[in-house]
Amino acid sequence: MGRGSFIMRILILGAGKMGSFFVDLLSFDHEVAALDSDPQRLRFLYNTQRFTSLDEVDAFDPELVINAVSLKYTLQVFDKLLPHIGKNCILSDISSVKTGFKEYYEQTGHRYVSSHPMFGPTFANLGDLSRENAILISEGDYMGRIFFRDLYTRLGLNLKEISFAEHDETMSYSLSIPFVSTFVFSAVMKHQDTPGTTFKRHMKIARGVLSEDDTLLREILFNPHTKPKVEMIRAELKQLIQIIDDRDEDAMTQYLTRIRKNIQE
């Protein structure tokens, strides 16, 4: 299932940033079609069939579906798609939060595979992904997992395989905490005419994060595991405020020692 293997009929749902990425990635090795209700988003996709209606999927008869729409609509789109695909078609998603996905997949009767490319066009160099990561859910269809394992390995991604439950817990650390920290930085921001290096680096990250689609940001923040992490941030800020109020040098030294250990590789 990949370069040097047999050709598959693959349907990409959604022609946004990641949907377009997968079209570019797969369209020269497989027979690919992209479905999006907005024809404007299909304009610049090449070497692929372009669908704007679910009825067009029937004749294509995909063997694999990659759902790249936003999390808010992922399962809704699957529901609408199911009458238009065969029972042997493998369902897959690349969602950043997967709460309830395992239960959904199992009630469809379809084979399934789930993964999460831990990068996006905002920050990643799509020409060199060797420093980027991807998660492959260890549950689901064996052959589907082989397809995505081979695909991500070919891209040079660092791949980790974990369960659905472990995925959302992991995301609450790797995405929710940085995103919330960025929100706090941006919320208290004032324009600086002579910013220092650290400030400029934070500003670059903040602009990148906040350039993401609102739906994606909501997906990350509404992860059921996010709230406890935000409460941890609040508790740390409360402790730091107390140290500052007390001007307690020993407490500050202990605090810095502790947090430096947290970021050691």
Regions found by a protein language model. Give the residues of each.
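An accessory alpha-helical subdomain
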Residues: E161-E265
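Rossmann-fold dinucleotide-binding core
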Residues: V97, F101, Y105-N158
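ADP-ribose/adenylate-binding Rossmann-like module
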Residues: I85-F101
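Glycine-rich, N-terminal phosphate-binding loop of Rossmann-like dinucleotide-binding domains
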Residues: A68-S70, S95, S138
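Short loop/helix-cap segments at secondary-structure boundaries that form the rim of catalytic
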Residues: Q40-N47, A59-F60, K102-T108
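NAD(P)+-binding Rossmann beta1-loop-alpha1 motif at the extreme N-terminus of oxidoreductases
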Residues: F6-F51, E56
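Rossmann-like NAD(P)-binding element
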Residues: E56-L82
